[in-house]
């Protein structure tokens, strides 16, 4: 039986942890070569090594997705070393300005310093724009179409009190994918977003045990936290032939939250 991504080349930002790491490995299991791009160099190297163990070509690149020069260098290197880019998954993101630096605290918008707002938007929205447009230019040059996928959130549609910066950034990602789908369809390039629910990743570790987190689980009809693999399988569908007629959509692996 043929693999669903056999011979394809994928670039995954945020590819060394959480949803990005699960997607790097899932894509490799289905035959893709993978460029694992992440701000944590050692974690990117470790994930790339796991991709190699699965029999695929892998490269690891350290990148700050909010830096235009670094993003362009990442795309150029991935295209050169992999032999082109067929799929991009923009999974790099933060839940708050101090993500990774201690416990994430909710802040109402009127108490949110502008520099913290900008940090979240620069990674979650600017970073997706820079990554996906740079890859789109490469795909157009290659002339063989492609798949653009970005991680948004259920918070793109339903606001979370105290997380306005995150919600706005993820709503922007969804609209960005719709606009790219409209503009890139003539090149046989699809663009879609994924809006996960509550997923067990490093981003949610600080929240677990918090009453607000427990309420989020209780609002999930399936009454469980999602796994990174739940989202990786959604990305795999959009990257594969089965997802070839989806464009401008947002899919919600969320245990049923968005139907309410």
Question: What residue ranges belong to the model's regions?
Answer:
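Substrate-binding pocket helix/loop in short-chain dehydrogenase/reductase
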Residues: 99-118, 216
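Active-site helix of classical SDR
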Residues: 132, 169, 177
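Short C-terminal tail/terminal secondary-structure segment
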Residues: 2, 158, 235-236, 247-260
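Short, small/polar-rich loop/turn modules that mediate ligand/substrate recognition or access, typified
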Residues: 89, 185-190, 246-248
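Residue(s) in the substrate-gating loop at a strand-loop-helix junction
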Residues: 153
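C-terminal helical subdomain
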Residues: 193-196, 215-242, 246, 255
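Alpha-helical segment proximal to the catalytic Tyr-Lys
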Residues: 137, 141, 181-183, 244
């Amino acid at each position: 039986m043929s693999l669903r991504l056999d011979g394809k080349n994928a670039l995954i930002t945020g590819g060394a942890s959480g949803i990005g790491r699960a997607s790097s490995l899932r894509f490799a299991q289905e035959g893709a070569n993978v460029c694992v791009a992440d701000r944590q160099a050692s974690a990117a190297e470790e994930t790339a090594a796991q991709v190699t163990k699965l029999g695929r070509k892998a490269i690891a690149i350290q990148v700050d997705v909010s830096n235009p020069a670094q993003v362009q260098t990442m795309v150029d290197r991935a295209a050169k070393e992999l032999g082109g880019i067929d799929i991009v998954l923009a999974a790099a993101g933060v839940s708050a300005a101090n993500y990774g630096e201690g416990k994430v605290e909710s802040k109402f918008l009127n108490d949110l310093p502008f520099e913290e707002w900008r940090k979240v938007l620069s990674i979650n929205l600017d970073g997706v724009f820079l990554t996906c447009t740079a890859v789109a230019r490469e795909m157009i040059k290659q002339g063989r179409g492609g798949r653009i996928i970005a991680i948004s959130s259920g918070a793109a549609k339903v606001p979370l009190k105290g997380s306005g910066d995150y919600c706005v950034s993820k709503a922007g990602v969804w609209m960005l994918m719709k606009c790219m789908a409209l503009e890139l369809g003539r090149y046989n390039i699809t663009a879609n977003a994924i809006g996960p629910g509550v997923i067990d990743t490093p981003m949610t570790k600080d929240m677990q045990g918090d009453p607000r987190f427990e309420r989020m689980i209780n609002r999930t009809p399936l009454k469980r936290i999602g796994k990174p693999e739940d989202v990786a399988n959604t990305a795999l569908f959009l990257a594969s032939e089965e997802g070839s007629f989806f464009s401008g959509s947002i899919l919600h692996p969320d245990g049923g939250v968005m139907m309410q």
